[in-house]
Amino acid sequence: MKLWDVVAVCLVLLHTASAFPLPAGKRLLEAPAEDHSLGHRRVPFALTSDSNMPEDYPDQFDDVMDFIQATIKRLKRSPDKQAAALPRRERNRQAAAASPENSRGKGRRGQRGKNRGCVLTAIHLNVTDLGLGYETKEELIFRYCSGSCESAETMYDKILKNLSRSRRLTSDKVGQACCRPVAFDDDLSFLDDNLVYHILRKHSAKRCGCI
């Protein structure tokens, strides 16, 4: 319950207590008849009491005040406990919700890596790292083809594979489709450490296919 809700409840209770009927021992005097002989009207009402006011005031008012004070004290103590408890529950819910998602995500990533086809992959290298005997500080983005070509197999490829397994084609080796470049990047020109000019042609893949 918020603070304003408690204040509203307290106001309603105070209004209810103030609307209680007068306690026993208090009564209203009836209005006296008009005195025509004196030519003026006396005071119409008067309040009389058999006892003092503080002793006859309803006990319910004290109960209402006690309830209001207890509610305010309880409300002051509760926010800190709720603030400490809610984050724990929220963290537990988030952890429980994240675990299945993480496991499903890992499963999907594993399936994509296992069943992916022939794709183009890039890596940042130095020309010297290519192992062609060049000593240079020149760098490049080397792209290569990788992946499986099983999904690209035609009926012809399947028949050849079956015949090879059954040893019907023992005299010949049957080649399988592999992931290869079908187009290459532009030529790469560079100077080595001895200021010798070199050109690399068809050095990096541009598009890949199963051939």
From Swiss-Prot:
Q: Which residues are noted as glycosylation sites? A: N126, N162
Q: Which UniProt keywords apply?
A: Cleavage on pair of basic residues, Disulfide bond, Glycoprotein, Growth factor, Secreted, Signal
Q: Its GO biological process terms?
A: branching involved in ureteric bud morphogenesis; cell surface receptor protein tyrosine kinase signaling pathway; commissural neuron axon guidance; dorsal spinal cord development; embryonic organ development; enteric nervous system development; glial cell-derived neurotrophic factor receptor signaling pathway; mesenchymal to epithelial transition involved in metanephros morphogenesis
Q: Does the keyword Transmembrane helix apply?
A: no
> What cystine linkages occur within this chain?
C118-C179, C145-C208, C149-C210
Q: Where is this region: Disordered?
A: 76-113
Q: May I ask which residue range the UniProt record assigns to the signal sequence? A: 1-19
Functional description taken from the UniProt entry? Neurotrophic factor that enhances survival and morphological differentiation of dopaminergic neurons and increases their high-affinity dopamine uptake. Acts by binding to its coreceptor, GFRA1, leading to autophosphorylation and activation of the RET receptor. Involved in the development of the neural crest.
Q: What interactions and quaternary structure are annotated?
A: Homodimer; disulfide-linked. Interacts with GFRA1 coreceptor and RET: forms a 2:2:2 ternary complex composed of GDNF ligand, GFRA1 and RET receptor. Interacts (via propeptide) with SORL1 (via N-terminal ectodomain); this interaction affects GDNF-regulated, but not constitutive secretion. Also interacts with SORL1 in complex with GFRA1; this interaction leads to GDNF endocytosis and lysosomal degradation.
The protein in question is named Glial cell line-derived neurotrophic factor
Organism from which the protein derives: Mus musculus
The primary gene name is Gdnf
